[in-house]
Regions:
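Conserved GNAT acetyl-CoA-binding A-motif
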Residues: 93-106
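Conserved active-site alpha-helix within GNAT-family acetyltransferase domains
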Residues: 105-131
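Conserved acetyl-CoA-binding loop-helix of GNAT-fold acetyltransferases
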Residues: 78-91, 103
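Helix-loop element at the rim of GNAT/NAT acetyltransferase active sites that forms part
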Residues: 16-29
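A short, internal acetyl-CoA/4′-phosphopantetheine-binding micro-motif in the GNAT/acyltransferase core
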Residues: 70-77, 106-107
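A conserved beta-strand-loop-helix scaffold within acyl/acetyltransferase catalytic domains
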Residues: 29-41, 46-47, 53-64, 68-70
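C-terminal "cap" of GNAT-fold acetyltransferases
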Residues: 124-151
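A short beta-loop-alpha structural element at the N-terminal edge
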Residues: 2-14
Length: 151
């Protein structure tokens, strides 16, 4: 298995994998258009051509980025793929000069194992103003904001 930059021919598999978790309310859904528009920010773990994990890097400000759409195929869960994808995103973020990597998540225990700590969502104004204001869950957000300092 290896982590690669996503390419356009990966989008259908990426969409299908994200949809499984979006339908469960675990991650936000992503449209095909959104995936194509952010293709350069997506990383995939492949095994024999099959995408078994995906993660996105979304820059929010001068030193802040978010890990988005982190999902691993259920058949491969528990094998460290999620952690490898988080570390890949962190590595790429450092190359861009990013110092703080955040996630809004329901998976607090997983992200804690990846060196993230819980913070107030309101301590991340870049995220709140960019995305949260237009989210239907804004006033009743039940996701946990977590941060990892990477530089």
């Amino acid at each position: 298995m290896e982590i690669l930059n996503a390419v356009s021919t990966d989008v259908k598999q990426i969409h299908q994998l994200i949809k499984v978790y979006a339908d469960k309310g675990i991650v936000l859904p992503r449209s095909y258009l959104s995936l194509y528009q952010h293709l350069q920010c997506l990383y995939v773990m492949k095994e024999e051509g099959k995408i078994v994990g995906v993660a996105g890097l979304h820059v929010l400000g001068e030193d802040l980025a978010e890990i988005r759409s982190l999902v691993v195929d259920d058949q491969y869960a528990g094998n460290g793929i999620g952690r490898l994808l988080v570390n890949k995103v962190a590595e790429e973020a450092v190359k861009l000069g990013i110092q703080r990597l955040i996630s809004l998540t329901y998976e607090q225990e997983f992200f804690a194992k990846c060196d993230f700590t819980v913070v107030s969502r309101h301590s991340l104004p870049e995220k709140v103003w960019v995305d949260c204001m237009s989210c239907p869950k804004n006033d009743a957000c039940d996701e946990i904001a977590m941060i990892r300092f990477i530089a």
